[in-house]
Amino acid sequence: MKRYVRVSSQVCAWSLAVGALIFLTAADLFAQGRGFNGLDMDLANLPRLSNAQTRSISPENFTGEKGKAGMATEGTGKNAARDLGQGWKISPSVRIPAKSTFTMGEINGSGAIQQIWMTPAPLDKTQLYILRFYWDGETSPSVEVPMSHFFACGWGKYAQINSLAVCVNPGSAFNCYWPMPFRKSAKVTMENLDDKDMTLYYQINYTLTDVPQSMAYFHAQYRRESPLKTKGLYTILDGVQGRGQFVGTYLAWEVHSPGWWGEGEIKFYIDGDKEFPTICGTGTEDYFCGSYNFENHETKKYQTFSTPYTGLAQVLPPDEIYKVGQRFGLYRWHITDPVRFDKDLRVTIQALGWQSGGRYLQEEDDIASTAYWYQTEPHGAFPKLPGVDALKVGPLQVQN
């Protein structure tokens, strides 16, 4: 009996050793990238190998197929390449006719869009170029936003944006780094609502890979009220049903009263909140991670800034302060602090200034917004996009 116990103990120890070896080997294989899907890329995991496949859609490869780029014999660069021929920048861009929709790219399979670059012409009509994204064959887009507002540059004029999620670079280069996973398909379109043709250079960089069930779908929605329908109150987002997380806000704000305009609080109504929200800010500039009116105490002017997570990237005109008619572009990305919800979400912001006697003033400003969030599908219906006249940016008129 003692010998049997001794042998059994040896077998048990041997089994544990083998099990540990198998575990360590599996862990090592995983560390080498065998279990990595190529998503969630950052500086720390760049050395990790994966089975993901990199693809790219552009006017030089409309399908993104392997080995099919740079083959065009017709395109916007044909005349410039007439002495060089195929392979020499024959199709670097597309012309999108007035009042038409162009499919920028269609992807089949599972994966994620990881970066988008585009540059339009003309720049001052970008509020009339509508971006739409569709996931997994849906007929109602998950993204429907004017191009300029999607890239946090909504006043039809160039503004440098130096953020993690969006970059706007010289001279009119719009870049997006929001991860956009899909499981069956993805489609990206551009509608030209202008009465003139537009030129678009673009590239959609994506990966084909497995997408875990824990990943939700990217959404973005545009709204505008001019003037505000409810004095002093603007709704950034409502009607969201499902589970997800709110990840960003862009506001294009035109002031219609003199003085400081940003005392209003942003409020997040989460999972059934009615009269009172779960999250309430302390002021507009506070939400955008500034303070005390964004004022530079030396110049006595608004101080623009653009950082990885937040910015006041546009002040028009830049050399005035507290004037009626001034315009502002502000962004706030919740990359490290997403606002999570399990059932529903509503987001509002107050338009609040000052009047005599140290009293708050409910403003009647012109506010346009883009809300960015991830959620499970299906998503709720979006509000109807404003008409062309409501999308246009009128001339800047500042009152002294």
Protein language model features and the residues they cover:
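Initiator methionine at the very start of the polypeptide chain
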Residues: 1-2, 31-32
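Beta-strand-centric surfaces of beta-sandwich/beta-rich domains
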Residues: 32-400
